[in-house]
Amino acid sequence: MINGGDYFKNEILLISMATLYLWYSFRYARKTNLEELEIPTKKIIGQFLVTFLISQLFYYTGIQFLQIQSDSSASFAENISHGYSLSLMLSVSVISPIEEELFLRGFVQKGGFRNSWLGIFLTSSFFSLLHVPNDALSFIYYALSGFIYGTSYKYSKTLWVPILCHIGHNTIIVVRSFFYT
């Protein structure tokens, strides 16, 4: 890890490396015809809004009633206790969602499983494991979040919908942390 978990250390290097990695990932996805990353149409924007609304309703239900906990949320809380850094906010709200969606939905779900329901189920489970849930209920919660993103990709046929939903979701978490920490 470039910053050793300290988002203030080597902040510019971390942002530069992540930007380079994302640029290369998008380039690779386009070159291999894994995904047509064109400007989103009105239909795609509509699909994004519906999926985002569903994911946010699901998120607030999980937060209000289920007390979902994971090592990734605990790590985020620990990092912001030391203050906010640009690299932390970009990593959580933009970089990680793009990386996760390109890899899980693009490479694994579409590339490995041809966008099948089995692929959605497996990538949803892997998505949950990436967030290191602390109990079975948290695992199910994160897997269902992954299922929402995977299903949105299957029906929209573009990575823009799950990418934008995931970015929006994580950005709301970052913004909420300004007010509730």
Identify the function of each model-found stretch.
Residues 1-12, 64, 69-74, 175-181:
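Juxtamembrane/transmembrane-helix boundary motifs at the membrane-water interface
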Residues 27-33, 100-104:
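C-terminal ends of transmembrane helices
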Residues 85-181:
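Transmembrane helix-loop-helix hairpins at the membrane interface
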Residues 1-29:
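Alpha-helical transmembrane segments in multi-pass membrane proteins
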Residues 6-13, 72-79, 138-149:
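Non-cytosolic membrane-interface motifs at loop->transmembrane helix junctions
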